[in-house]
């Protein structure tokens, strides 16, 4: 049997995706599932698809297990998109798309995907094959199948990490619109179709070369950059693309597809492909990206953030699209820092940044942080979102007089006595008979009240007098109590009246609010956008968690912790990786974060070390406004906060200390409240409660945020706060199980410690 599927949720994304890895070796734990894990990252990247991983599973190359999983994810979990990776080659056990015949001359048999799908999507399979063939001739050995089952799109991707990523990018521009079509998202589909109608038809070439084949013409479409097109218009001469530009990637297709289609599907140019050279050391993918560009027009570097509304300018700051191409010179200039690292002896011995009080720093962060714009989402994706509009009921609830209890609909004026039963009214049905004097009708909870009745008597206040011979019907019942008019009946509009405001602008939605939207039939709502957060760690000493330790190296924990902290609050994240202590690398990484995210979080490189260049890069290269560079607090003294305003769009930058505990504490103190404000929460401040100390605590000259575990004792109104032990800022163990931060005052001559049982303020940072 297959390994147990891992179900993940992220309520903030609209496209629910399942990733299915088909591999005997991965299933038996003989190999790592690099392809599946990479696809999950690509799906969740807000600058690409911006989807939610709702299901993930590894199965062996067994056709029945593949089919069982696909059917379950389509019919039961109702996913929007399923990506399979593996089993698409020529090997005997490659049965994901279709199975080879067991005996000669018996014809091609259906495999897992072909047996499951109801309609094929051959265009997507063709796009993957064409793109793969431009990368390697071995692409012809792939047998992908794409198709539809119900409202779910199923895509077969290759088994390798590289191949699956490339094929995912080839089809990415069309995925959001395809899913909108399957979900019958009428508004979004109409917007796209309207934009397609508005697109001008390309003029025919003035004198096409006689050797130009239809295939070549297909490759040429959409490749020219806008600047070159403008030059051609001015000169009145039309030309075709050079034959070397034959690899049509997602980015190239995006140049001719409406933004509403590609808002979640633009290929992002990796940092290491900015150069146009195609040396043998480059990967085939990098070479293919370079071949897309002409000598004067490199691959577009701009991206659009997910769900950007039609006509709204890209929020990419200085990289805002002014033209679809930048020169090689501009790209190289942007990649070099102006920070001088040669004069080590002249570096600062004392920080040039004044100490800022915690209160002032916190107020500054909230004052400088903007509230993001709005977007329209499906109500199912509203968990954790903030409404940007009032929501009104369009119908009464209940829309008919409804019974509150199981019993009998009666005429109150009849009083107690024996009554004939004329039928029944059940929930979901409208009774057609009228209750006359001396009659009653049996009703269930929630059922409509029949005409003529004006009260309900619960079944407990009745006695059955007569039934049918076979016991299947009640014929006569005795009413034992006097009913009053309106008794146990919910009148029309009793719960919600038509036109009533059921949810106000600024409401932070939870499960009840989602249910209320469903109740009133409001399936699309306007909400504030979620901020996209990019996270990176800095330091030459850092290794990825999966790497073996080397002399002088440590594993990077900050990035994982910060990403998890942000994701715990539901915000989409971008992993920028580890960046070395080099101004050029820092500048490139920051530029990438600025182009893809609303908020950039870094850890390390902000203290007084000779390799701490981050503040200089922010100041000298990016011309960011550094609002504070030191905070009078423990831990987190070198915490830095900066903003960057480009073309009317503000980017927020938090440069956090490199010590693990300092990074987590300052993230909770500054970053999380800022993100809450950006998404429109009216009071973004953290929750602070009172608690009693479980032990004596010595005070520090600085205000301290001491990690603790909050627990409640029986019949005591206040929780007790237990210290997590050694509070050294490098000791991440002090954060283990911590759900609160003791907000300790600075030491004075009168107070050098707080004693057990004293009441202190505690900031809640975890589940209680």
Swiss-Prot record:
It is a lipid-anchor. Residues 200-212 have a biased composition (Pro residues). Its cofactor is Mg(2+). The gene is Gphn. GO terms for cellular component: cytoplasm; cytoplasmic side of plasma membrane; cytoskeleton; cytosol; dendrite; dendritic spine; GABA-ergic synapse; glycinergic synapse. Residues 194-245, 273-316 are annotated as: Disordered. Residues 326-768 are annotated as: MPT adenylyltransferase. This is Gephyrin.
């Amino acid at each position: 049997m297959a390994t147990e599927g891992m179900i993940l949720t992220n309520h903030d994304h609209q496209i629910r995706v399942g990733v299915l890895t088909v591999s005997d070796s991965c299933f038996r734990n003989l190999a790592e599932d690099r392809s599946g894990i990479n696809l999950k990252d690509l799906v969740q990247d807000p600058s690409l698809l911006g989807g939610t991983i709702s299901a993930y599973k590894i199965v062996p190359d067994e056709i029945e297990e593949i089919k069982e999983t696909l059917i379950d994810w389509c019919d039961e979990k109702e996913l929007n998109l399923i990506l399979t990776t593996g089993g698409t080659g020529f090997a005997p056990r490659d049965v994901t798309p279709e199975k080879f015949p067991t005996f000669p001359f018996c014809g091609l048999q259906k495999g897992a995907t072909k047996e499951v799908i109801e309609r094929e999507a051959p265009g997507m399979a063709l796009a993957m094959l064409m793109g793969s063939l431009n990368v390697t001739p071995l692409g012809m050995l792939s047998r992908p199948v794409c198709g539809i089952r119900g409202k779910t799109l199923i895509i077969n991707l290759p088994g390798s990490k590289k191949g699956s990523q490339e094929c995912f990018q080839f089809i990415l521009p069309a995925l959001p619109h395809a899913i909108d079509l399957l979900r019958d998202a009428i508004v979004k589909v109409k917007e796209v179709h309207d934009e397609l109608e508005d697109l001008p038809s390309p003029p025919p070439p003035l004198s096409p070369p006689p050797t130009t084949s239809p295939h070549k013409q297909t490759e040429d479409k959409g490749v020219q950059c806008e600047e070159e097109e403008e030059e051609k218009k001015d000169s009145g001469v039309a030309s075709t693309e050079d034959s070397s530009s034959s690899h049509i990637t997602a980015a190239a297709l995006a140049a001719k597809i409406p933004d509403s289609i590609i808002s979640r599907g633009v290929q992002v140019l990796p940092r290491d492909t900015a150069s146009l050279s195609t040396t043998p050391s480059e990967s085939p993918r990098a070479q293919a990206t370079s071949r897309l560009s002409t000598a004067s027009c490199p691959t577009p570097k701009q991206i659009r953030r997910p769900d950007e509304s039609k006509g709204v300018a890209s929020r990419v700051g200085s990289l805002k699209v002014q033209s679809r191409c930048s020169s090689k010179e501009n790209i190289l200039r942007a990649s070099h820092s102006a920070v001088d690292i040669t004069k080590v002896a002249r570096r600062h011995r004392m920080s040039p940044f004044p100490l800022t009080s915690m209160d002032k720093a916190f107020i500054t962060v909230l004052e400088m942080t903007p509230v993001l714009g709005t977007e329209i989402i499906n109500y199912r994706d509203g968990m954790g979102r903030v409404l940007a509009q009032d929501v009104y009921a369009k119908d009464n609830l209940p829309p008919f007089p409804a019974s509150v209890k199981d019993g009998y609909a009666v005429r109150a004026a009849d009083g107690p006595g024996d009554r004939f039963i004329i039928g029944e009214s059940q929930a979901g049905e409208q009774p057609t008979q009228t209750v006359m004097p001396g009659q009653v009708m049996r009703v269930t909870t929630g059922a409509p009240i029949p005409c003529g009745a004006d009260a309900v008597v619960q079944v407990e206040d009745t006695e059955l007098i007569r039934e049918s011979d076979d016991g299947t019907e009640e014929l006569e019942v005795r009413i034992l109590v006097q009913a009053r008019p309106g008794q146990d009946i919910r009148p029309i509009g009793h719960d919600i009246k038509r036109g009533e405001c059921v949810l106000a602008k600024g409401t932070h939605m939870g499960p009840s609010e989602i249910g209320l939207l469903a109740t009133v039939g409001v399936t699309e709502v306007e909400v504030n956008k979620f901020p996209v957060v990019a996270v990176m760690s800095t330091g030459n000493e850092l290794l990825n968690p999966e790497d073996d330790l080397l002399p002088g190296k440590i594993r990077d924990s900050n990035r994982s912790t910060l990403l998890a902290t942000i994701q715990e609050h539901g915000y989409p994240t971008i992993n920028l990786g580890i960046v070395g202590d080099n101004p050029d690398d820092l500048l490139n990484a920051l530029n990438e974060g600025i182009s893809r995210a609303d908020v950039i979080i870094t850890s390390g490189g902000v203290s007084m070390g000779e390799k701490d260049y981050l503040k200089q890069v922010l100041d000298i290269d990016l011309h960011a406004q550094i609002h504070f560079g030191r905070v009078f607090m423990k831990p987190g003294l070198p915490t830095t906060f900066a903003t960057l305003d480009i073309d009317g769009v503000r980017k927020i930058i938090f440069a956090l200390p490199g010590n693990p505990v300092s990074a987590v504490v300052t993230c909770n103190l500054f970053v999380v409240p800022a993100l809450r404000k950006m998404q429109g929460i009216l009071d973004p401040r953290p929750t602070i409660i009172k608690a009693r100390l479980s032990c004596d605590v010595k005070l520090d000259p600085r205000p301290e945020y001491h990690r603790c575990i909050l627990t409640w004792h029986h019949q005591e109104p206040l929780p007790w706060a237990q210290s997590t032990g050694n509070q050294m800022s490098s000791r991440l163990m002090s954060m283990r199980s911590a759900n609160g931060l003791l907000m300790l005052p600075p030491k004075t001559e009168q107070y050098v410690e707080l004693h057990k049982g004293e009441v202190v303020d505690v900031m809640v940072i975890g589940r209680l």
